[in-house]
Amino acid sequence: MKFSSVLALAASAKLVASHATVFAVWINDEDQGLGNTADGYIRTPPNNSPVTDVTSTDLTCNVNGDQAAAKTLEVAAGDKITFEWHHNSRDSSDDIIADSHKGPVLVYMAPTEAGSAGKNWVKIYEDGYNDGTWAVDTLIANKGKHSVTVPDVPAGNYLFRPEIIALHEGNREGGAQLYMECVQFKVTSDGTTQLPEGVSLPGAYTATDEGILFDIYSSFDSYPIPGPAVWDGASSGSGSSGSGSSSSAAATSSAEKTATSTTAAATTTAVATSTSSATQVQPTSVATFTTSVRPTTSAAPTTSAPTSSAAPTGGTGTGSIQIYQQCGGMNYKGATGCASGLTCKQWNPYYHQCVQA
């Protein structure tokens, strides 16, 4: 097999070992139980593979995201919503997402009907790159949790869309990996702050946006978070706190958004003080996520072969690693031996992968 074909196949395999989805939600620090089950409240995809085509309708709420979940959680303005991400299971040993998957964490919201159609998405939270720390690093440190505060919007049904953009392959067009789900909420308080028009998803990103096509292995001091500015009517949880201590995050327009990844400060908006009436859903078992490869209809990128096939660095374990699994890279601690007929290729300093020899 030609090396270019191997590279294309590896790109479509999505580096399946290190992905993540939202497993659960907390409201005002109360666990709402597993939401990614058949009777849950998250529009959960069939696997934890990322979306890499920013023009795909899967960018709205992921695969099957147009299908409503069984339940809807109730919240009120001022309530704190905490999203909890995991790789394979809601277990203390879960690695959340590979630490090589550097990138920003964002949250959008939209009225349910419009949001399901990919329209009127309003960004209410973002965290990117601050003083050498990526939002994904903070997410892992906080055991997969990040928080937002429910704005003082009119009563009704809304979708909240947490998102991770992993940039470990963002140095090539089509390499960024986007992870998102839509969580169903009913806002019971009746606020007077109307959501602005919002953006379309897909539509808000392009494959060549500075924050999508971004080389994390180059020298840089700041990172331009993709998409619109954070709505100035949003009051979102701090990006540095897993418990989601409340702080305001906003900007007045997309044009005023700077290339730094710090969350823009703005005057805190007033929120109602009513408390959540969410029905608590207790998990009956710990769900696990089976990682699989989702085929895509878009053409695989044609990329020149790496100039070096350096031996894996950082791996200390031994074992027989299967095709497309990680076998090395900076800070990698797992096994480094590929199965028979495979070789460990270096795609970048942080990620080496078993591919056909």
Swiss-Prot record:
Lignocellulose is the most abundant polymeric composite on Earth and is a recalcitrant but promising renewable substrate for industrial biotechnology applications. Together with cellobiose dehydrogenases (CDHs) an enzymatic system capable of oxidative cellulose cleavage is formed, which increases the efficiency of cellulases and put LPMOs at focus of biofuel research. It is found in: Secreted. Residues 1-18 form the signal peptide. The keyword Secreted applies. Its EC number is 1.14.99.56. Binds 1 copper ion per subunit. Its cofactor is Cu(2+). Disulfide bonds join 61-182. O2 binds at residues 168, 177. Residues 292-317 are annotated as: Disordered. GO terms for cellular component: extracellular region. Residues 319-355 form the CBM1 domain. Optimum pH is under 6.0. It catalyses: [(1->4)-beta-D-glucosyl]n+m + reduced acceptor + O2 = 4-dehydro-beta-D-glucosyl-[(1->4)-beta-D-glucosyl]n-1 + [(1->4)-beta-D-glucosyl]m + acceptor + H2O. Residues 295-313 have a biased composition (Low complexity). Induction: Expression is induced by cellulose and xylan. Expression is also induced on lignocellulose, such as steam-exploded sugarcane bagasse (SCB). The degenerate binding motif 5'-SYGGRG-3' that binds to creA involved in carbon catabolite repression is present in the promoter. GO terms for biological process: cellulose catabolic process; glucan catabolic process. Residues 19-234 are annotated as: Catalytic. It comes from the Eukaryota. Its main location: secreted. Cu(2+) binds at residues 19, 101, 179. Residues 235-318 are annotated as: Ser/Thr-rich linker. Gene3D superfamilies: 2.70.50.70. Pfam families: AA9, CBM_1. Lytic polysaccharide monooxygenase (LPMO) that depolymerizes crystalline and amorphous polysaccharides via the oxidation of scissile alpha- or beta-(1-4)-glycosidic bonds, yielding C4 oxidation products. Catalysis by LPMOs requires the reduction of the active-site copper from Cu(II) to Cu(I) by a reducing agent and H(2)O(2) or O(2) as a cosubstrate. Active on carboxymethylcellulose (CMC), hydroxyethylcellulose (HEC) and beta-glucan. Also active on soluble cellohexaose, a property that is restricted to only a few characterized LPMOs. This is AA9 family lytic polysaccharide monooxygenase B. The lineage of its organism: Eukaryota, Fungi, Dikarya, Ascomycota, Pezizomycotina.
